[in-house]
């Protein structure tokens, strides 16, 4: 059983295969994505007592035709599907004085029939459930109380595939803009599709494409800071530079800004492969708000908007750290918290630990029995944590 600070109680909320992201429907049903089986499950707590009474499969891809299971950031070691190591791709010798411009394929936002393929992020908006597949954004017509999809989804746009596979979705408070996170194809190669290593902005119907922010290697979690339209992301940085480089991070995301990848990290610190490249671009690289130990694999992020936790947790953020595969001593495998004071983040602290079954030193693979992925605040003010290795959702509530 994972361990939370004194005053909290941890329990198993649900058991289901490889749960990843979670989102609440307008009526309080909890929707859970499982990319490995291309399934979306719905859990219903009709009497709001914090225990679900009904469970159903909202949507599932056919056995044949579903997208292959995604390779999540750092989930099993540097095998098939892992980001390539340094030494491949464009190097500084071919880089010019200005960052290259690019345009996505002209028909990438062409609407049409859709399907489910390794779904990850989800969002409810204006009578639809939006789903981030690895290779597309689709939406299902949704009526309050639906436990099963009303037919096949509509595809709004295509996304590049390969490499980092998670696609998350977030709407602004007015519901006028949709934001989609797309990770890089490689570890740190230049010259990728400009829709990658970025947060993209669209209208709710998939039109109006633009790059909202770039240079973010693998932005996985997305959340709005309470009371604002400020986007925050939890992000996986690059590998193969030793145990302590490069730190992962959680950060607010500023419109039109560049966050360094692949040319630099933590602002203007050059990646060894690109020293001297694109100085004007690197000079304006943003320093992230909250640094997280390297290779922790920061995935889900949510702000605490409930009222059951102590005041110090209000409007602070929880981040799920999925855990490392390439450190001499394991990092991550826990949920961390950082408070917000006058809109600024404080230092991170452990919140939910105990997912490692050893000290995590010099092990391949790491001996663990759980890996946190998604975090969300339940309707009764608890924190839910999905665990795709332990195949369950954990609930952290205040002790009564």
For every predicted segment, state its role.
Residues 1-4, 64-74, 111, 166, ...:
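Beta-propeller domain segments
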Residues 9, 18, 36, 54, ...:
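Beta-rich catalytic cores
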Residues 22, 122, 169, 219-222, ...:
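Hydrophobic core register within WD40 beta-propeller blades
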Residues 27-28, 126-127, 174-176, 228-229, ...:
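Short coil/turn segments that connect the beta-strands within blades of beta-propeller domains
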Residues 31-33, 131, 179-181, 232-235, ...:
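Residue position within the beta-strands of beta-propeller blades
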Residues 39-42, 128, 136-138, 198-200, ...:
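A short loop-to-beta-strand structural motif that recurs across blades of beta-propeller domains
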Residues 54-73, 96-125, 134-174, 181-184, ...:
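Asp-box/WD-like beta-propeller blade repeats and closely related beta-sheet repeat scaffolds
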Residues 373-400:
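Blade-level signature of beta-propeller repeat domains, shared across WD40, Kelch, NHL, RCC1
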